[in-house]
Amino acid sequence: MANETLRLALQPREITGKKVQSLRDQGILPIGICGRGIEPYSAQVDEREFNKVINQAGYSGLIELSIPGQKRQVAFLLEVQRNSVTNRIIHADLRVVDANAPVELDIHVALQGENDMVSRGNAVLNLVQSVIRVRALPGDVPHQIDIDASSLTEIGQQILVKDLSLPATVEILDDVETLILTLGYPQAEEAPAAETAAE
């Protein structure tokens, strides 16, 4: 499912360097804006509003930027820096993209549904590949790639990249034979086999 475009109101930022701490003390987050075809510039945003938007968008959600004196821009979150003690976001970078040109992004895999064998303790799900590389127009980028965990009913069954079902507007760039998910024995059941082999 493609993303709903989120909106973020930014203000130009003139304060840089160590002085940006004064902004953080006021609940204002310093932002860096970059992207192909634009001159990088500094901005700032209300910290609470930013956290609200980013909690929904993550790294694959399209964000429409509103900046006084500038034309409409759309962007993806590129990077965040956090305080090592409090884990509070202290700086973020946004990457402006062309809404009409394809982008390449890593999209997280999300397991959906309940697997009966796992629930009974007879198996474990092994997520081998947690992100999938895709190419799509910014407005068509999926927020996540859902996989039905209940579809695996026997030990050894697998889900590969070629088994994924995505809209025609989204191109998967990973090798089609890449393993994503497998249903295996619980570790406790594998141990006896390993001991037998050792003997």
From Swiss-Prot:
User: What protein am I looking at?
Assistant: Large ribosomal subunit protein bL25
Protein family (similarity comment): Belongs to the bacterial ribosomal protein bL25 family. CTC subfamily.
Q: How does it assemble?
A: Part of the 50S ribosomal subunit; part of the 5S rRNA/L5/L18/L25 subcomplex. Contacts the 5S rRNA. Binds to the 5S rRNA independently of L5 and L18.
Which branch of life, at top level? Answer: Bacteria
Q: What does this protein do?
A: This is one of the proteins that binds to the 5S RNA in the ribosome where it forms part of the central protuberance.
Concerning Pfam families, the annotation shows:
Ribosomal_L25p, Ribosomal_TL5_C
Q: Which NCBIfam families does the annotation name? A: bL25_bact_ctc (TIGR00731)
Q: Does the keyword DNA damage apply?
A: no
Intrachain S-S bonds: none
**Source organism (scientific name):** Herpetosiphon aurantiacus (strain ATCC 23779 / DSM 785 / 114-95)
GO CC terms, sorted: cytosolic large ribosomal subunit
Which PANTHER family does the record cross-reference, listed alphabetically?
A: RIBOSOMAL PROTEIN L25/GLN-TRNA SYNTHETASE, ANTI-CODON-BINDING DOMAIN-CONTAINING PROTEIN, RIBOSOMAL PROTEIN L25_GLN-TRNA SYNTHETASE, ANTI-CODON-BINDING DOMAIN-CONTAINING PROTEIN
Q: Which UniProt keywords apply?
A: Ribonucleoprotein, Ribosomal protein, RNA-binding, rRNA-binding
Extract the InterPro entries matched here: Rbsml_bL25/Gln-tRNA_synth_N (IPR020056), Ribosomal_bL25/Gln-tRNA_synth (IPR011035), Ribosomal_bL25_b-dom (IPR020057), Ribosomal_bL25_C (IPR037121), Ribosomal_bL25_long (IPR001021), Ribosomal_L25_dom (IPR029751), Ribosomal_uL5_bac-type (IPR020930)
| A GO molecular-function descriptor | structural constituent of ribosome
Q: Which GO terms describe its biological process?
A: translation
Q: Keyword Ribonucleoprotein on this protein?
A: yes
- What HAMAP family does its record include? Ribosomal_bL25_CTC
